[in-house]
């Protein structure tokens, strides 16, 4: 699994844990948490399109937590090299999928 997968999952987990309190130093519509500003962008982009922006996804440290859905990762047709959060049973689990899939994304920068 590529490094971008780990980064993407880390961002999704980070966004889900945000308190919702806006910091005084973040622009309007951004959320401050632990010294960084975060924003969810609802427009859908591939990983490569989102990566072209000037924002950092995370500190690029290795993941030490995994929450794969049952039977995942299964790399269908040797084409599923990215991960998204999926809730087939009401609980968010990881599922591998093609990297060209479109999803909302989160950007972050240090204050």
Curated annotation (Swiss-Prot):
<dbReference type="InterPro" id="IPR018378">
    <property type="entry name" value="C-type_lectin_CS"/>
</dbReference>
<feature type="disulfide bond">
    <location>
        <begin position="26"/>
        <end position="37"/>
    </location>
</feature>
<keyword id="KW-0430">Lectin</keyword>
<keyword id="KW-0479">Metal-binding</keyword>
<dbReference type="Pfam" id="PF00059">
    <property type="entry name" value="Lectin_C"/>
</dbReference>
<feature type="binding site">
    <location>
        <position position="96"/>
    </location>
    <ligand>
        <name>Ca(2+)</name>
    </ligand>
</feature>
<dbReference type="InterPro" id="IPR001304">
    <property type="entry name" value="C-type_lectin-like"/>
</dbReference>
<feature type="disulfide bond">
    <location>
        <begin position="82"/>
        <end position="99"/>
    </location>
</feature>
<keyword id="KW-0964">Secreted</keyword>
<comment type="similarity">
    <text>Belongs to the true venom lectin family.</text>
</comment>
<dbReference type="GO" id="GO:0030246">
    <property type="term" value="F:carbohydrate binding"/>
</dbReference>
<dbReference type="InterPro" id="IPR050111">
    <property type="entry name" value="C-type_lectin/snaclec_domain"/>
</dbReference>
<dbReference type="GO" id="GO:0090729">
    <property type="term" value="F:toxin activity"/>
</dbReference>
<dbReference type="GO" id="GO:0046872">
    <property type="term" value="F:metal ion binding"/>
</dbReference>
<feature type="binding site">
    <location>
        <position position="95"/>
    </location>
    <ligand>
        <name>Ca(2+)</name>
    </ligand>
</feature>
<dbReference type="InterPro" id="IPR016186">
    <property type="entry name" value="C-type_lectin-like/link_sf"/>
</dbReference>
<dbReference type="InterPro" id="IPR016187">
    <property type="entry name" value="CTDL_fold"/>
</dbReference>
<protein>
    <recommendedName>
        <fullName>C-type lectin lectoxin-Enh1</fullName>
    </recommendedName>
</protein>
<feature type="short sequence motif" description="Mannose-binding">
    <location>
        <begin position="72"/>
        <end position="74"/>
    </location>
</feature>
<keyword id="KW-0732">Signal</keyword>
<keyword id="KW-1015">Disulfide bond</keyword>
<feature type="signal peptide">
    <location>
        <begin position="1"/>
        <end position="23"/>
    </location>
</feature>
<comment type="function">
    <text>Mannose-binding lectin which recognizes specific carbohydrate structures and agglutinates a variety of animal cells by binding to cell-surface glycoproteins and glycolipids. May be a calcium-dependent lectin.</text>
</comment>
<feature type="domain" description="C-type lectin">
    <location>
        <begin position="33"/>
        <end position="108"/>
    </location>
</feature>
<keyword id="KW-0348">Hemagglutinin</keyword>
<feature type="binding site">
    <location>
        <position position="80"/>
    </location>
    <ligand>
        <name>Ca(2+)</name>
    </ligand>
</feature>
<keyword id="KW-0106">Calcium</keyword>
<keyword id="KW-0800">Toxin</keyword>
<dbReference type="GO" id="GO:0005576">
    <property type="term" value="C:extracellular region"/>
</dbReference>
